[in-house]
Amino acid sequence: MTQDLLATARSWAAADPHEGDRAEILALADAGDTAELERRFAGPLTFGTAGLRGPLRAGPAGMNAAVVTRAAAGLGAWLASAGHTGGGVVIGFDARRRSDEFARVSAEVLSAAGFAVQVLPRPLPTPVLAFAVRHLGAVAGVMVTASHNPPDDNGYKVYLGDGAQLVPPADREIEAAIAATGPAREVPRSDDWGTLGDDIETDYVDAVVRALDPGRVPAADRSALTVAYTALHGVGAGTTRRVFAAAGFGEPASVPEQDAPDPAFPTVAFPNPEEPGAVDLLLALAERVGADVAIAEDPDADRCSVVCGGRQLTGDEVGALLADWLLRRGVRGTYASSLVSGSLMHAIAEAHGVVSAETPTGFKWIMRAGTDAAPLVYGYEEALGYSVAPSVVRDKDGISAALGVALLAAELKAGGRTVLDRLDELAREHGLFVTGQLSVRVEDLTLISDAMARLRSAPPATLLGRPVEFADLALEDPPVDAVRLLGDGVRAIVRPSGTEPKLKAYLETVVPVHDDAGIIAARGRGADELDQLRAEMASALGL
């Protein structure tokens, strides 16, 4: 076994076109480090609907030049099989380590495969790439990014010609095309590709501002708003400033330590606004400048977190606020959220007499909601992803969402209110919707399958003392590996994480609110019920 592994490693190295990666594998082979080689050769990175994502390291189980070369070749072969040879492909990249290199490698491979390749002019946010695919009429797009993953990761995200992420079976077909690709060193390359000008960012900025129509908020109200902001060491700052300026806002006060792109993300443990401590510097800045609202984007700026009054809002709270804002503006069509997101948005939509839809998890599904009669006009998921302008970007977009939050906050401030006040008003109108998670990390993945089997075979009949109905979402179309327990004012959805060895239960309880005085009591009761719901679900799962 050891000799076979060493031979496999040396064979991979011989076919690796990157000198540094080749030397890395050979050094491990020469040292006889079979434990590390087993990790590197445990199997190729899985190409899923979000593309590739993994640690930066040599070998088939890492993000490196050889893996990206074969991924680009597989993507090109799949596009060719669909009749797209000669079409345009747009490639973007963030500021993570080797992102620019992987973008260049992809351009060389796809150009040699017969595609008209254009690369974004510099590290830019993922929403700019998603916009460019549709704006330029490309047949596909590639974004080299690992979004909010740890610093040592990178990724390879693929968009179809409509500017949306892949859905099955395209991911499996591309994965098969990658597997059928020969050694990376033998993949043809060409320098016959181009670089887009800065006007692509300008076009994105103009499209976002046009879609959200800031002129509906008086100029004085926009200029009176104080916004604090952080890019979390990512690539969002420049584009976000341009959008805010074009919309008539003053420049946001930015966390200086986190403003410039830095692939080491030195001030945070994880560059994810959801993680504890990630927005501490933003909170301090917001207090220092007296910000009306504070916004944190993740490193590729496709998600954003909102802070008001020293409190970080949940994704469900922001999702409901933005839906309510658009509905009060008269934006009609389909409002969609993923099945693990909260229910308040649907209650608001129903009150306005508009269609709302629940989709499987992920923006790849949210963006496909809607009909000809009621096209998608808004979508969100609880993990801080929002689409306030799906006509511009068919994916989550933290920059346009940030502008939407600022416009909402400016409108409210003009009336002497804040976004927290509007949340209280929504609670009085619809009830207090309290959402949270039970998340269990495991070392042994069989614990997850065992827990799901236990829940399917013996689901609880009640939660919080209320009868609940059980639904196995694996039996629906499209099938989802999840179960739902739904009762009057209580809900639990349980599924394995798609990216981590975790089992997640998404929990919700609804507490009636009868008057202003009842808000505080309702929040206390909601917190208690959420704690009880966590305990009941942990017991039901045997965890």
Feature roles, as predicted:
Residues Q3-S106, G197-A224, V235, I493:
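An N-terminal, well-structured beta->alpha segment
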Residues W12, D16-G20, E36-F41, L45, ...:
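Gly/Ser/Thr-enriched, mixed-charge loops and adjacent short helices
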Residues F41-A61, A146-S147, A231-V243, Y380-E382, ...:
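Conserved phosphate/anionic-ligand binding catalytic regions in large, soluble enzymes, centered on
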Residues V90-D153, V243, G248-V306:
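N-terminal small/polar loop signature for handling phosphorylated ligands or for N-terminal nucleophile
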Residues F102-L110, D152-L160, T240, D302-L322, ...:
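Short Gly/Thr/Asp-enriched flexible loops that form oxyanion-binding sites at enzyme active sites
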Residues Y159-V187, G319-A320, D324-I348:
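Glycine-rich phosphate-binding loop plus the immediately following alpha-helix
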Residues E287, A291-V293, E297, V306, ...:
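Phosphate-binding and adjacent anionic-ligand microenvironments
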